[in-house]
Amino acid sequence: MAVKKPENLTFEAAIEELDSVVNQLESGDLPLEDALKKFERGISLARAGQEKLTQAEQRVDILLQADDNAELTPFDANDD
């Protein structure tokens, strides 16, 4: 099976693959060249996931702006 480009994966698939890549890298069992390839793939997956999150946030903002009664507040990932 061909490896999909990160931007063509769903958010969930990208995060799942990223988790797998991180686990493989953390194991320390990969030869250096393989580890570098996995690291590169992981960076691509993380960037694609972040882009999908940004797009989702923008869609939510647009939907909230369309509702005249809704108060729009900036998204802050650090709010707990």
UniProtKB/Swiss-Prot annotation:
SUPFAM superfamilies: XseB-like (SSF116842)
GO cellular component: cytosol; exodeoxyribonuclease VII complex
Enzyme class: hydrolase
Intracellular or extracellular location(s): Cytoplasm
Keywords (A to Z) from UniProt: Cytoplasm, Exonuclease, Hydrolase, Nuclease
Entry's EC annotation: 3.1.11.6
Any one GO MF annotation of this record: exodeoxyribonuclease VII activity
Residues making up the signal peptide according to the UniProt record: none
Gene3D superfamilies, alphabetized: Exonuclease VII, small subunit
InterPro entries given in the database record: Exonuc_VII_S (IPR003761), Exonuc_VII_ssu_sf (IPR037004)
PANTHER family: EXODEOXYRIBONUCLEASE 7 SMALL SUBUNIT
Protein family per UniProt: Belongs to the XseB family.
Annotated function: Bidirectionally degrades single-stranded DNA into large acid-insoluble oligonucleotides, which are then degraded further into small acid-soluble oligonucleotides.
Protein name per its UniProtKB record: Exodeoxyribonuclease 7 small subunit
Recorded name of the encoding gene: xseB
